[in-house]
């Protein structure tokens, strides 16, 4: 392993909850997912991950993993994104990842429209838009502690702070 590669590995180990062996296994998994050998995973390749293709939030997951917004996921983004799903990841870090799912425009806040869009992805056609909007409005009213019409991370955390969120954000990829 070259100096650059070992520095990347070191950074990944520091920035995630994965050890060297887990990162190596995930690298092999990444290479299998990268069907065209481009060194990145595109949306179609991402959707072949078990548990992702059937997830109603698959498109949002892709966007959150794709930190630089270029439409593909490189190995570092893959590892960083998967780290949120590790059983070793703290509840706080899992909540930060969940917050990113809702924060579509990446401005550090969840607005009414963003909450509606993500919840619509989850409920699909099971609720009429009017019913869903009522739920979104009620959620925003209850969670928006400072009354600015949007949720910051602290408000989001307080609204969803429960063991079920952390356990729901655990995925066995290794």
From Swiss-Prot:
InterPro entries: EF-hand-dom_pair (IPR011992), EF_Hand_1_Ca_BS (IPR018247), EF_hand_dom (IPR002048). The keyword Repeat applies. The keyword Calcium applies. GO terms for molecular function: calcium ion binding; phosphatase activator activity. GO terms for biological process: regulation of cell morphogenesis. Ca(2+) 3 binds at residues 103, 105, 107, 109, 114. Residues 21-56, 60-88, 90-125, 131-166 form the EF-hand domain. Composed of a catalytic subunit (A) and a regulatory subunit (B). Belongs to the calcineurin regulatory subunit family. This protein has four functional calcium-binding sites. This is Calcineurin subunit B. The gene is CNB1.
């Amino acid at each position: 392993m070259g100096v650059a590669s070992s520095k990347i590995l070191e950074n990944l180990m520091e920035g995630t909850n994965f050890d060297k062996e887990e990162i190596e296994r995930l690298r092999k998994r990444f290479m299998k997912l990268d069907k065209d050998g481009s060194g990145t995973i595109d949306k179609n390749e991402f959707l072949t991950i078990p548990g992702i293709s059937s997830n109603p939030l698959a498109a949002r997951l892709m966007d959150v993993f794709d930190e630089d917004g270029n439409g593909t996921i490189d190995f570092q983004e893959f590892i960083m994104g998967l780290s949120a799903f590790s059983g070793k990841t703290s509840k706080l870090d899992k909540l930060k990842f969940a917050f990113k799912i809702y924060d579509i425009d990446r401005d550090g806040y969840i607005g009414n429209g963003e909450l509606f869009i993500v919840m619509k992805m989850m409920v699909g056609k099971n609720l009429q838009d009017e019913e869903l909007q009522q739920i979104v409005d009620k959620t925003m009213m209850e969670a928006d502690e400072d009354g600015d019409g949007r949720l910051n991370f602290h408000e989001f955390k307080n609204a969803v702070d429960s063991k079920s969120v952390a356990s729901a954000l655990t995925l066995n990829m290794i």
